[in-house]
Amino acid sequence: MIKRILAALVGLSLTSLVFAQSPPLFFKEVWTINGAAHAIAPGENVLTSANLELKLYGPSATASDPDKRIWISTPPTNIWTGMTTTPFAATLRDKENYVDLTGTAKVRWITRASGFHAVHPVVKLADGNYYVGEHSDANTSGFLESEFMFATQRWMKLDIERVVTKGTYGPAQDASAWMREPIDLSKVDEVGFADLIPGSGHGAGGYVNVASFEVYGKPVKRH
């Protein structure tokens, strides 16, 4: 009986320690839409948080043809990649703080995918380099909430202009392109997601939706 009580107390202490070490909510973005689903126009604000900046990457981010750009859609309000003709990435940047994504820092987001598409995490470090993470969410049966920690990821360097992965050959000409050394997540400038496959257009076929997007990590002042 005493052993059971001690085991329960130890378990409770460990649980309390985990919660005590959990980082705070750094930001939560649920997007806003004016009217029906449409291509995001240059300079259009689709953010609900005034302290965030949205960065769009890849040729489809600035395409002159609205039917080749990234869209804002609903319901729920989400970023939709179906009309993109190239790989695409979007990130969020806090105007006042970097974010420390070490330890138990995590993302919690609501996503959906079609075809072979998947949502991957993207970070821009304080040194200006971009990386895309191994984690992917590709649920096709509806919008699904999921979460993951940054510290558990393997990363590949990301050519942000084209939104394609880059790397060097490893031992025995291994072409996986994973970073061989851990990346420094203690001061991250931007956090977002990538769809590494062009969209298929209207209707089911190939795209991702990213709705509610939460990042948990410790703020680090920019100045």
Please provide the spans of the model-predicted regions.
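Intrinsically disordered, low-complexity segments enriched in glycine/proline and serine/threonine
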Residues: 6-7, 32
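Beta-rich carbohydrate-recognition modules and glycan-binding surfaces
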Residues: 21-223
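Pyridoxal 5′-phosphate
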Residues: 11
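Positively charged n-region of N-terminal signal peptides that target proteins for export
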Residues: 1-4
